[in-house]
Structures are given as C-alpha cells and as structure tokens.
Curated annotation (Swiss-Prot):
Region named Disordered: 1430-1451
GO terms, biological process: basipetal auxin transport; cell adhesion; cell wall organization; cellular response to cold; cytokinesis by cell plate formation; embryo development ending in seed dormancy; embryonic pattern specification; endocytosis
Gene name for this UniProt entry: GN
Statement: the UniProt record of this protein carries the keyword Protein transport: yes
Main location: cytoplasm
Organism: Arabidopsis thaliana
Subunit annotation: Homodimer. Interacts with CYP19-4/CYP5 in vitro.
Protein name (record): ARF guanine-nucleotide exchange factor GNOM
UniProt note on regulation of activity: Inhibited by brefeldin A (BFA).
Ranges for region DCB domain: 1-246
Length: 1451
C-alpha cells in the first residue's frame, strides 16, 4: 500500500559510497579493522576530555563508564566474527556509537566523532535491505541521531555537530536499506533537518548553506522513489471519510509539527530531540500555526498509526509535500499586489520552499497523477499559493513559480486545465503586459516564462483547443499571441531585450506550426463551420477526447459558437432584446426562447454587461423569473460556505438596486444553496434571511457613509431564531461576520476591464468547475487547428516581426525575423491563406527600399553594404519561388523589386527568357529581331548596338573602368566586397525561376502574375515616353511573353490579357520603337509556338495578327521585312495547324502586304510558294485566299518579272488540286454533299480565272503574255471539274470577253505604257477561239448560246479592225479569219451551225453570216457552197432587220 518496492535501489544523488564485497574472510577482516579504527578514534577523543580521561588515572578500583565499556567490548568481539558480514546484525557494531550520540554526558567533540563513525559505516555500502535485523538497525540510527544530546562548549563545535547530524540523516536516506524506514521515520528525518535549517538562520553562514542543501537532497532522494511506488488510488480513496476541501487546502490526517527552539548560553546542554520537529498525528495544519510554532497533538487513530509505521512510501511523501506547501502559507503578506520590500524574509522562506517543491515535482514527474492525495495538493493548495506568489514583487520568487508551473505543465497538464488558465490569465498576462504596476524585472521574468512555454511544441495548440475553444474559458491562446505581438513592438523607444524576447516567443509559435506542416496532412475535413439550426450546446461533450477524428471537429464547432456568442454579447450590451433576436437568428438560441438556454447564455458568455444581466434576472416578468431560477441552478454550492457561495453568485451580475428585485434574486440563490448545502440551515427561508443579513452587513461595513459600524454582537443578535425558530451556531455566525468585514462582497463587479483577481471565492469556484470541466485534450504533432490559429495571429505577427526587422541592427536578429517570415509563408501556403501571404510580401518589399536608384548615389554599393536589404530581397524571392502558387496581389510588389533590380542592371541575363526552344532564336537574326534572352539593361541602347553594361557584370566593369571624361579612382576593397555580396545575393534569388517555372503555378496565381506584369508595364501613351519608362515596359512585355510561352497548355487563361496589352501597344504607337518591336514580334512568336498545341485557339491566335495589319504606316514599313520573315516561319512551321478560312485570311493578308515591299516580298512570296507549290497545304478553305495572294505577287513589280511569272505558275498549277478535290468528293460524298462541293469548286475556279484575268492586263509583256497562257491553261484544263453550264456563261462574260475588251482598250489608248501589244492581242484572240471550241458542246446547250456566239463574233470583228501604232496588225489580219474559219468548220461538223438549226432557227444562221461577212466575205461560199444561191435574197432581209446594235443585242 503505497510503499517502496524492496527491489528498487536508491538513486544516489551526491556521494558514491565505498563498495565492499563481504563474501570472503579477508573483507570481513578489513571491515573489522575499519570499525576498530573508529572505536579507537572515539576513545582517543574521550580520553582527551578531563571527565573521561581522569577515570583511567585514578587509583581507585572504579568500574569504567558504560559508554567506554561498550566500545571496548565491541573491540573484543569485532575480530572474532568470521561469518559473512551481512549475517551480522548492524546493531552489534552501531549500538556503542549510537549510545555515545544519545548520551547527554558527552561533549560536542565526542558526539561529532561518533557521528562521523556512524556516517562512515553507513557509507561503506555494507548495509542493505538483506542485512540481518536491518529494519531495527535503521530505526535505531534515526531515533538515536534525531535524539542526539551533547554539551555545548562553543558555537563552532555546536555547528560541527549539527552538520554531522545532517550528514548522517542524509546517508541514512541514501543507503540501500532506507527502504526499511517507516513513513514516520522519514517524516522525522525531514523534520529534524528542517529544524536545523530554521535554527541555522541564527548561526553561521556555512551551517545555513549545508542545512539547506541537505534538506534539498533529502527531498530529492525521497521523491525520486515516487515512480517506483505502487499506485495507491484504491488504498487511499477507501480511507475513512472523504477529503473535504472547503478551506481550499488538503487537511492531512497527520502533519509535521515543530517545537520552538530555546536559545541557551554557550555552556548549556543541546537537546536535538527537544529542538527538532516531532511527529504528531492529527489535523492540526501548519497553515494555521506555522512550521516553527507550537503544535498540539491529538490522538491518532489506530489506522493512522498503522500507515505511519509501514515502510515508507506515498503517505510520507504526501505529508512532506503538504508540509512544504504549508511553508508558503506563513508568508501570506507577500501576496497579490503587495508592495512591501522586506526581501530578507519575503524571498528567503518562499524561495526555499518553492525550490524544494520544484525538486519534488521534477523527480515525481507524471507519477504524481497516480496518487490522488498528492495530485489534490498540487491542484488546490500548491496552485493557490503559486497564484499568490506569482504576483510577488520578487523576480526570484516569480522565476521559481514559473519554473514550477512549467514542470507541472510538462508532467500533469491533463489534470490542471483550469489552474493553468487561471495562472496565465491572472499572473503571466497581468505581469507581462506591465500595465498594473509590476517592475521591469517582473515583466521580463513573466515574458521569459511565457516564451519558455511557447517553446513547448504543443503548448499553444493545447491552449487553443482546451481553452479558446471552450465556451466557459477565456481565450488564452488569443491573449498570449496578442501579448507577444504587442510586446514585440518598440513604441517610441529603441529595440530592447524585452522586444527580442517577445519576438523569440512569437517565432517559436510560428515555427511550431511550420514544423507540424512537415508532419503530414491531417486527412480531416477542416472546412468552414456552419450552424443550420439550434441544438442545445452548452453542456455537450465530445464522444472521444483522445481521437482527432472526434475532437477536432468538436472544438472547431465550439470555437465557432464562442465567436458568434461574443458578437451576440456585443449586440446584447447595446440592446438586450435585439441581442437575443440576433442569437436566435444565428441559431445560438432556439426560435422560441426557453429559460434554460437564456440562463446558460447569461452564465457562461464572457463580456456581457453585468448591469443588464442583473436587471433581466431581477425582472418580475414570468419568463425572467424562470430564467433566474435556471440561472441559479447552474451553480454548484456543495461544501461551500454561505458567504463564499453568495460572493460567487453575485460576481456574475450586478445586484439590482430595487428591493423587490433583490428579493427575487436572493430567493433564487437561497433555494439553490439550501438544496445543495442543507447541513446547518433548517430551511431555504433561513438561507434567505441570512443572505439578506450578509448583504446588509456588507453594506454597513464597506460603505464610507455609514459612521457607526455593526459589531459582531449586533450581527449575531440580528440573526437570532432565524433557523427554523432556533439560533445558528455562534461560531458559524462569527466566521461569517469576520469574512465579510475582512473581504467585501462586491455588488458592483468591474466590467471586464483589466485582469481578474483570484479571490478565495473564485478559487473555490474554480476547484468546483475543475471536477466538471471537459477533459484536457493532448495535441499530437499534426496541424489539426493551425489554420484557425494562424488566421487569428497572422496579421499582428507579420506586423510585429516587420517592426523588429525594421528597428534591428544585428544580423542575428535579422536572421530570426527572416526565419519567422519564411515560416509564415510556409504556413500561409499550406493553409491556402493567400491574403496573409500577400501581406507578408508587401511587408518584406518595404525593406528593399535601398534598391531605389534615387535614394542613394551608389545604389549598387549601398545594396551590397545593407545586410537587411539583401536578406529581405533573398527572402522575397525565396517565397516567390517556393510559395508562388498562393501569391495574388503580392506579385505587384515582387515585380516592383524586380524592376528596381532591372533599372540598376543587376538582373542575370536570362530572366526574361522563355526557357523553351532557344534554338528557334539564334544570334543570326538581324536588326529589330525579338530576342528571347535580350535582357534588361540599365539604359536603353539604340537598335542594333551591342549592349554594354547590361547585367551585373556590366555594372561591375563600369565601376572598374576609367571614364573617358573624368578619370575614376580604383575601387576600394570595401567596394569590391560590396559588389561581390550583391552578386551573391542576386544569384541566391533565382529570379529567372519565377518565370521559367511559371508553368507549375496554380491558375489564379499565374493570372495574377500576368496582370501584375501588365500593370507594372504601365499604359503606353501616344507620342514619346521617357526611355526609362519604355525600358520598363519592354522588360515587362518580355516577361509577359515568356510566361505566355511557358504556359501554352493554359494559354486560354492568359490570352485575353496578353492580347489586349499587345493591342494597346500596337494601336497607340505611331513611330518605330523597341516596345512595339517586342509587342509585334512577341505576338508572332506566341502564334508560332502555340499553334501546334492549341488548335482550338488557332483562329483566335491568328486573328490577333490582324493587329499587324492595323499598325501605323511608319511602324509597319519599318518592320515589314521582319514581319514577313516571321510570318513565313509561322506558315512553314504551322501550315498543317491552320484550318479555318479566317485564319488563312489573316495570314494571306499579311503576306499580300509584303508583295510590294522591296525587302519583305521575298520572304512573303517564299511563304506563298510553300503553301501552293506542293499543294499539301492548299485546302478549299484557303484556296481562293492563296490565289489572291499569288495574284498580288504576280501583279507586283518588286522582284522582277521572274517572280511574277512564278506566281502565275503557282496560280495555274493550282488547277490540278481543284480536279483532285472534285474527284475525291465524287468518290467519298453523297449526292447532295457532292453537288454542294462541286458548286464550291466551280466558284474557286471562277475566282482563279478572274485573278488571272487581272494579271493579263499587266504592263510587262512577258508577265502579261504568261498570264494569258496560264488563263488559257486554266480555262482549258477543266475536264476533271464538274462545272455547271451557267458557270461558262459567267466565265465568258466576266473573264474572256472582259479581258479581250480591256486589252483592246489598252491597245487603242496606252501604246506608250504597254510594249508589243500585238502579240498579246493575238494570244488573247487565240485564247477565245480555243476555249470556245473546247467547250462548244457545253456552250451550245446554253439558252444564251446565241448571245455568247454573237459576243465571240463581235470580238473577232473588232480584233480584225484594231490598229496597233496607227496601222492594222498583219498578224491579226491573218490569224483572225483562220481562227474564225476553224470555229465555223467545227460548228458545222458538230451540227451547231445549220441553216435551220433547232437551237436558233434561221436567226443563228443569219446572225453568223452577217458578222462573218464583215471579217471574211468569201468564207460562206468556201464553207457552204451548196446553200449560197438559195440564201441570197434572205441575206438582205436579215441584214435590214438586224443591222442595228439594239436588234443585235436583242437577239
């Protein structure tokens, strides 16, 4: 039952005893010699004394003194012992020495040497629990030493004896056989030591220190065994009766009581037995009499005596610990708010006691929780004293109190939830803020203690989970984190150690959160909490407080409710009715109010206006009365004095002033109190009357306006016969009277200002609550609640660390701040708190202000010399690279830093590179070419000029070089070092990674980065802008294009913004410049690179190139050649990916523009040739567009006739693809689709021949003639194309007849501009003849054949009459009749031209000969001799009727 296990050994604390193996005779002999030596030493000292030495010199035959006889007898025996030493009873060889010690005839020197002998024997390690008769021997040693008597001859020898006594008692406790000591003996040892400690205050310094050290070692030795002690819950709980705690302390059934020390003169006899503390059973507590005052014994029960005589264990430890706690009670004047400065006593005794208590807790550790009485002492009496001494003026005491609480937190926090809350609220927060009068030293100690707690990884999490998320507890985490943040701020003062200390605490909390992130995801759904309906929540418990799957969601919900309740309390304080309505609307009160829920709201919600609560509870309304009764029912008044219960009740609201309201309130209180504590009071009426009487006494005693105060007798007399007609016990009423007189009941409690004072009634309430409070939640190493916690503290924390960083001057402080910033960034990113990360970036960017070129003369050197700016810069870009996914508006500030570095020329040469397909942009590209890695330079250079001093090494070389105008001195070593530091800083930033790795950014972050680049570039203005602004805009545009190209898979996300930005630049620029250069060619690069990957966006990408078509003429002309090259590249690389007509229209438009540009036309034509020559990239969608583009090149005089002829060949050769498409359509399509396709192909063919028709009018003879040949080829090679009959009619009207007419007109009027028109006309008339004959069969089917035939004849007739250079053409005169004759023969052969033709009757026949006669009169006779004579008369008729043009046209 709570005893030490015999097998556990003593944990030595101080000296290692000599080790002897007593298994052989030689060792037995050795030990015998040692004991003989000690006997000799004692006898020698005794002989020196006159009293003892004279007996040997006497001649009388007197017997020797019994002390000497026993020593000599031992001397005779000791060498005769041959058995193993452990079988010899220690009493045999200890008794003679102990007799000397106990004798009152021996002086101090003799007693001292005897004590030394016992000490040596105990330290020989020859005695253990297995030694014979060891129990009696150990008891004898303790009894003898604690009963030591000796004559005091001088103070020094007295102190030596006392020190020897301490040595022997400590050796007893450290000996392996100490387990055989009883609880009573252990208490006696401790009491004896304490008496020496107490007396040492009046003696030498050395004795004081030795006594205290021994006391300390004793406590350590005793409590080091607690982990080895069997659990004692059952044994101790089953003891008689229950432990009452009404006096806020554990009243032991046995206690150490001390007797006073009587001071004697130098020759007086010293009696340790009478001067030491003696053991007494009973309930007389040292709390009342003090550890050094007289104590009265009371008879001990047989059970108590039984416990105390058993081998020592928990009972003695409980007694000792209770004794140590009681030492704190004798100095209550050191209490809260005390300003006494009697440090000598105020510090000495409490410090001594606190040190001993701390040692006991350190060694007992978590084992204490298994022993209810020890735990109860700590929960109540110890913690109450700690709360008191925590507000001591002494920093030493405060420091020790904080150390004890930290140890208790480590070992017993699950049992001390509310005690810890009270300590932080009433002590740490109060002192650390420094607002309520503590000294700077107190404030510093409190802050150090808080920081120590923050360094415990789970401390803040557990405070948040157990207290902040408990509706009935204060927000300790929130208050502590706010305190740390505020204490970090230097307000109108330089940075001090206190600020750095608070910073350390803040960083410790943040880094704890960051470390938990590394421990893996929680796997829990931690989304926002909502309340959809009211459910009673005040007394709800979690299903399992040890399983995160249960408690995490539970406490988050409780915190949400608590936060909403705070808002509700604020509404209630402004208007109680609207406040309750608000709570109903947020489902914190039921839709129909019930008394219990409103009562709980009043009872457990912090921050309520207590005046309003009191008025509500005192109201006569029936509902309010019900609420009052329910409110009283929430209190636990069991085992509580009436005045304590009343104090507790009235602290929760302000007692109304009206008597009726007071009556109602006290009635509710009295009924509840009587229900729970009916021991003394006869009925609830007695409780009511007495409560009224207490209120009246309180007013009488503490109202300054009352001159004549009520006496104790008056109070007792006033309360006669109130207890059911009988009197209450006088002692009971007297106790009430003095309690009220000494401690006022505050009926007007303070409204939440400042920190609560831990009054006795509040402490009793806390102890009652602690029995019912929710279990303490132990947090593991995962980030269950960090999101919610960090959201609370992030803002103040960033501000606090930033202020310290701003004010700091030492690099170690800088590094601490940087560690904090990086931890904040990590947490923000992990929990997706984008706003927090943005705030952090904004704060950090402020510290790079030295990068601003205007702030200093040599910004690069200044940057290199400024450690703070360099560290901040590295941190910003570390955050951007690591946590860029969660940066939003912060990109603007980051870009601001990048632009500052860019303006100084400090950026590495590849920041703006798109890091993809670099081979695409080689150094061979000429002037005006957009280079992917053309990087920011400090100053704009003219186009094509090599950039000097762009980038960091350029700046460095500038520093090293000699200026041509003003020679510079060589840079100093400091300047070189500063430049080297700058170089290293920029390298560590990895700025280029932000953009090259942008493909890994989350979509929203990427979009914000792009927007930030557009914003940073600024809006281009029409007209001239400063070179610096343009350089910035160019740099931003390069970066924007780089991230666009790096994010081709997400181009849809970026495209709108990128396009609009480039469009703004293109449309606002009226002169060639670097910015529009980057914009145009950046756009072309984007299209080139993205078309293969985003066919769905191809039309939009290509449509964007229309911006190039809209460029100002001067700009377009300057870049036309390069545009052509880029478009040509685009076409060659992506022709397969351009499918739509709209896309090709843009491309061909761009190519067509180049046709007339001297430098650009070659590239443009190259692209057109690429598309049309092989035909692999020619589609129905782009056919007409490509033909038109080729026509532009054919008509262009740039590139000589050869290129025009090549263009005509492209047009002519394209006919075969029409035939292929027609054949493919016929084979693969249905009838309907084929018909539509044939129609489309016919339209394409018509557009082809119309295009060729236009080129047939070219001034250049070879081009013109080649065009006619190509036209003839295209008109004649239509066999594979299914042209509709009507198409030929259009063809003759719009193409063939038109080109013949136009050429005829040119021949007639523009002879000077057109050379050798005769050959062209000849080709044209041959074209007409050939096409007509080839298509005669088709044409003859037309209803308009007559009209078409008339057109042919008319043109032939005109060409016969045409004059070239003033005379008729011989070639035409010769060719036209021949061609006509050929036509007529074919028509005759095919039956088209007959005298009575079915197609046109006589009119076609007559019409034909009318015109033929004008060309060749003899042809009719030659071709139709048989019909000549019969038709002579008819010719005249026809001639008369159809000779006019109107009639001719009408036919």
């Amino acid at each position: 039952m709570g005893r030490l296990k015999l097998h556990s050994g003593i944990k030595a604390i101080e000296e290692e005893p000599e080790d002897f193996e007593c298994t052989d005779s030689s060792n037995t002999t050795t030990l015998a010699c040692m004991i003989d030596t000690e006997i000799a030493a004692v006898l020698a000292v005794m002989r020196r004394n006159v009293r003892w030495g004279g007996r040997y010199m006497s001649g009388d035959d007197q017997l020797e003194h019994s002390l000497i006889q026993s020593l000599k007898a031992l001397r005779k025996q000791v060498f005769s012992w041959n058995q193993p030493w452990h079988t010899i009873s220690p009493m045999l060889y200890l008794q003679p020495f102990l007799d000397v010690i106990r004798s009152d005839e021996t002086g101090a020197p003799i007693t001292s040497i005897a004590l030394s002998s016992v000490y040596k024997i105990l330290n020989l390690n020859v005695i253990d629990q297995n030694t014979a008769n060891i129990e009696d021997a150990m008891h004898l040693v303790v009894d003898s030493v604690t009963s030591c008597r000796f004559e005091v001859t001088d103070p020094a020898s007295e102190e030596v004896v006392l020190m020897k006594i301490l040595q022997v008692l400590l050796a007893c406790m450290k000996n392996k056989a100490s387990v055989m000591l009883s609880n009573q003996h252990v208490c006696t040892v401790v009491n004896t030591c304490f008496r020496v400690v107490h007396q040492a205050g009046m003696k030498g310094e050395l004795l004081q220190r030795v006594a205290r050290h021994t006391m300390h070692e004793l406590v350590r030795c005793i409590f080091s065994h607690l982990p080895d002690v069997e659990r004692t819950e059952t044994t101790l709980v089953n003891r008689a009766g229950s432990i009452k705690q009404e006096k806020a302390g554990v009243d032991s059934d046995y206690a150490i009581v001390s007797k006073p020390v009587e001071d004697g003169n130098a020759n007086s006899e010293y009696d340790v037995e009478n001067s030491m503390a003696t053991f007494a059973t009973g309930a007389q507590s040292l709390m009342d009499d003090g550890p050094v005052g007289p104590g009265s014994r009371k008879p001990a029960s047989p059970y108590d005596l039984h416990i105390m005589t058993e081998p020592y264990g928990v009972p003695s430890m409980v007694e000792i610990f209770h004794f140590l706690c009681s030492l704190l009670n004798v100095v209550e004047h050191v209490g809260m708010g005390s300003r006494s400065n009697t440090i000598a006593f105020d510090e000495d005794v409490p410090l001594f006691a606190l040190n001993l208590i701390n040692s006991a807790i350190e060694l007992g550790g978590s084992s204490i929780r298994h022993h209810p009485r020890l735990l109860s002492l700590i929960q109540d009496e110890l913690f109450r004293n700690l709360m008191q001494f925590g507000l001591s003026m002494s920093p030493l005491i405060l420091s020790m109190v904080c150390s004890i609480v930290l140890n208790l937190y480590q070992h017993l926090r699950t049992e001390l939830k509310l005690q810890l809350e009270a300590f932080f609220s009433c002590v740490i927060l109060r002192l650390a803020q420094g607002k309520y009068g503590p000294s700077y030293q107190q404030q510093e100690v409190a802050m150090e203690a808080l920081v120590n707690f923050c360094r415990q990884k789970s401390f803040m999490v557990e405070m948040y989970a157990n207290l902040d998320c408990d509706i009935t507890c204060s927000n300790v985490f929130e208050e502590l984190s706010n305190l740390l943040s505020k204490s970090t701020f230097p307000v109108n003062c330089p940075l001090s150690a206190m600020h750095i200390l608070a910073l350390d605490g803040l960083i410790a909390v943040i880094q704890g959160m960051a470390e938990r992130i590394s421990n893996g995801l929680t796997g829990l759904d931690l989304g926002p909490v909502h309340l959809d309906e009211y459910t009673p929540f005040w007394m709800v418990k979690c299903d399992n407080y040890s399983d995160p799957n249960h408690w995490v969601s539970f406490v988050r919900r409780r915190k949400y409710i608590k936060r909403r309740l705070m808002i509700g309390a604020d509404h209630f304080n402004r208007d109680p009715k609207k406040g309750l309505e608000f709570l109903q609307g947020t489902h914190l009160l039921p839709d129909k109010l019930d008394p219990q829920s409103v009562a709980c709201f009043f009872r457990y919600t912090a921050g309520l206006d207590k005046n309003l609560v009191g008025d509500f509870l005192g109201n006569h309304d029936e509902f309010c009365v019900q609420v009052l009764n329910e409110f009283a029912g929430t209190f636990d008044f069991q085992y509580m004095n009436l005045d304590t219960a009343l104090r507790l009740f009235l602290e929760t609201f302000r007692l109304p002033g009206e008597s009726q309201k007071i009556q109602r309130v006290l009635e509710a209180f009295s009924e509840r109190y009587y229900m729970q504590s009916p021991e003394i009071l006869a009925n609830k009426d007695a409780a009511l009357v007495l409560s009224y009487s207490i209120i009246m006494l309180n007013t009488d005693q503490h109202n300054v306006q009352v001159k004549k105060k009520m006496t104790e007798e008056d109070f007792i007399r006033n309360n006669r016969h109130i207890n059911g007609g009988n009197d209450l016990p006088r002692e009971f009423l007297s106790e009430l009277f003095h309690s009220i007189c000494n401690n006022e009941i505050r009926t007007t409690p303070e409204q939440g200002a400042g920190f609560p004072e831990m009054t006795p009634s509040r402490w009793i309430d806390l102890m009652h609550k602690s029995k019912k409070t929710a279990p303490y939640i132990l947090a593991d190493s995962r980030a269950y609640l960090d999101h919610d916690m960090f959201a609370i503290m992030s803002g103040p924390t960033i501000a606090a660390i930033s202020v310290v960083f701003d004010h700091a001057e030492h690099e170690d402080v800088y590094q601490t701040c940087i560690d904090g910033f990086l931890a904040i960034a990590k947490i923000s990113a992990c929990h997706h708190l984008e706003d927090v990360l943005d705030d952090l970036v904004v704060s950090l960017c402020k510290f790079t202000t030295l990068l601003n070129p205007s702030s200093v003369d040599e910004p690069v050197l200044a940057f290199g010399d400024d450690a703070k700016a360099r560290m901040a810069t590295i941190t910003i870009f570390t955050i951007a690279n690591k946590y860029g996914d969660y940066i939003r508006t912060g990109w603007r500030n980051i870009l601001d830093c990048i632009l500052r570095l860019h303006k100084l020329g400090l950026l590495p040469a590849r920041v703006a590179s798109d890091a993809a397909d670099e081979s695409e942009h080689s150094s061979e590209q000429g002037q005006g070419k957009p280079l992917a890695n053309s990087l920011s330079s400090a100053h704009l250079q003219s186009m094509g000029t090599p950039r000097r001093s762009s980038g960091l090494m350029g700046r460095f070389s500038q520093l090293l070089s000699l200026d041509t105008e003003e020679p510079r001195s060589q840079p100093t070593e400091q300047q070189l070092a500063a430049h080297q530091r700058t170089l290293q800083t920029i390298q560590k930033c990895h700025i280029d990674s932000i953009f090259t790795e942008s493909k890994f950014l989350q979509a929203e972050s990427l979009l914000q980065l792009a927007r930030a680049l557009i914003w940073a570039a600024g809006r281009p203005q029409k007209g001239t802008s400063s070179p610096e602004d343009e350089d910035t805009a160019v740099f931003c545009l390069e970066l924007l294009i780089a991230i666009t190209l790096n994010n081709r898979d997400r181009i849809v996300l970026l495209w709108q913004g990128v396009y609009e930005h480039i469009a703004t630049i293109a449309q606002s620029t009226v002169m060639p410049c670097n910015l529009v250069d980057k914009a145009i060619f950046g756009l072309l690069r984007i299209c080139q690179r993205l078309l293969p990957y985003k066919e769905s966006l191809a039309d939009e990408l290509l449509r964007s190139l229309q911006l190039v078509l809209k460029l100002d003429a001067r700009v377009a002309d300057a870049y036309c050649e390069q545009i052509a090259i880029e478009v040509s590249r685009l076409v060659k690389a992506n022709a397969n990916h351009i499918r739509s007509q709209a896309g090709w229209r843009t491309i061909t438009s761009l190519l067509s523009i180049t046709a007339r540009h001297p430098e650009a036309s070659e590239s443009g034509f190259d692209a057109v040739s690429f598309v049309m020559s092989e035909g692999t990239h020619l589609y129905p969608a782009n056919y007409v567009l490509c033909v038109d583009a080729a026509r532009q090149f054919a008509e262009s005089r740039v590139g000589q006739s050869e290129r025009s002829i090549r263009a005509l060949d492209l047009m002519g050769d394209s006919l075969e693809f029409l035939a292929k498409w027609a054949l493919s359509a016929k084979e693969n399509m249905g009838e309907e689709d084929f018909g539509k396709m044939s129609q489309d192909i016919g339209e394409m063919w018509l557009r082809l021949v119309q295009g060729l028709r236009k080129v047939c009018l070219d001034q250049r003879e070879d081009v013109r003639n080649h065009a006619l040949q190509s036209l003839q080829k295209c008109l004649g090679g239509v066999d594979g194309i299914n042209l509709a009959h009507s198409m030929w009619s259009q063809c003759f009207d719009k193409v063939i007849f038109t080109v013949l007419d136009d050429l005829l007109e040119i021949a007639a009027g523009s002879q000077k501009d057109y050379r050798n028109m005769e050959g062209t006309l000849l080709l044209a008339i041959k074209l007409l003849s050939k096409v007509f004959l080839q298509q005669l069969q088709e044409l003859s089917q037309l209803s308009t054949f007559c009209k078409l035939w008339l057109g042919v004849l008319t043109r032939m007739e005109k060409y016969m009459k045409v004059k070239v250079r003033g005379k008729k053409s011989d070639k035409l005169q010769e060719s036209v009749p021949e061609l006509l004759k050929n036509i007529l023969l074919v028509m005759k052969t095919k039956g088209v031209l007959l005298q009575r033709s079915a197609l046109g009757g006589d009119s076609l026949w007559e019409l034909t000969w009318l015109h033929v006669n004008n060309i060749a009169p003899s042809m009719r006779l030659e071709l139709f001799p048989d019909q000549e004579s019969s038709q002579l008369g008819d010719d005249e008729t026809v001639s008369n009727g159809l000779s006019s043009p109107e009639n001719t046209t009408g036919s």
